């Protein structure tokens, strides 16, 4: 429920605060005082587009602040609202209410605040959408649009889940259908691409490269190309350490022999110091002997056949053939091969693959067709009930002979257009255009009097009749949203007399389950208010203020609304009659 709104520098309003209660609240005022700005402010709190031209002349920005409570809402809705608050880091006030604020700068962007935290306007709108249902004169014009009529019917039928399933199937079907059409149109290109990939993969498989093989080959080739030099170095080093491989003379001048002689000489004395040196020489001798042995093994492992280098060079040339075509190194070639195999699976142009895609398209179309039929049935069943309830509401709004109808027809197309349109074949055999919201065309029909031909609403209803149709529809739809604040901005335009009384009576009934806020110019409607607010000019600069009326002030305002009879005794008497009649009607 909306408990308070504060408006600053918006249109004709300089600074104004209005407090709201449960029940029916009406806002009245002379033309030009800015009573519609209250509704404009609520639209801003609902996330509507900010219009800098609405900022009051001389001010830098306009500010709208509202306070909402959620105690009258269903637990499910409250949980959704708490989820939005938690996601944005917003908080409730100590009394559990939530403050929302929107500022509109004359020169810069607008700003939105929810529970003390800055949020995008979209997030603010997501929160207040659950709390406010705003209806204005523009809604009457939207009501004649087919898409708005379908949305109203779906809202009544609770068709959200069915619509969502239909859209999901339609998206999947369109994607698969596009893939099939693309495959058929590009079959030659796909075949050529597949052939190129197969040839390349065959070439790579025939070479059978191993990860890192090209780098290992470079090291081997460098080693083999320096074979003679490596052998000479190793032979000389071994000879210096322990003699040549074929040297059987241990008395030579190599390091092992010399160190052996030194060790023997040191061990031949009784001097402890010299014998300690012998131990150290022995340790070094062990290392030298081991190095000499390993050098011998190295020499034995060196290739003696020059063909080893040739085979390495041939292998390197094979790998270079691949790296020139597919990647900078062998690891890159292997990665390219993996990706190409995946692409080749996608490019499967075999009859079996094409048949598989066709089968998937057919299955998705079958599921989509059934979902469309289910959605159509849901709408048709709901259309009959909704039409009866709206007709009953119109009777309560002084249109006892009015007839309201809803037709739900399938959007069939000629079979010749099947391939050119997003169309599905229905179980009945007909071909229907698969629109984003189903295969149905929804149309509201209306006849104001008995015996008149029912025509589309756009062609048959006057402004006043359209106002009552919209109000009747909203009253019926509102039964599923108890606790929501409903705001009507001059929906009674073009209405007067007995019809105005009936509208006031119906709004009062609606206010038993909802907080209802109405901007009206009709005294018959204003008389039914539980709270009467007037927007009036409060200064020489044309600024307006909002004031709560009671007693004689309220009588005077109703008299003013009665064709400007405010200062006359007859006007006041008539106003009191309206108030008394409304009070009795509500009791």
From Swiss-Prot:
ATP binds at residues 29-36. One of its GO terms (cellular component) is bacterial nucleoid. InterPro entries: DNA_recomb/repair_RecN, P-loop_NTPase, RecF/RecN/SMC_N. GO terms for molecular function: ATP binding. Keywords: ATP-binding, DNA damage, DNA repair, Nucleotide-binding. GO terms for biological process: DNA recombination; DNA repair; SOS response. May be involved in recombinational repair of damaged DNA. Belongs to the RecN family. NCBIfam families: recN. This is DNA repair protein RecN. It comes from Mycobacterium leprae (strain TN).
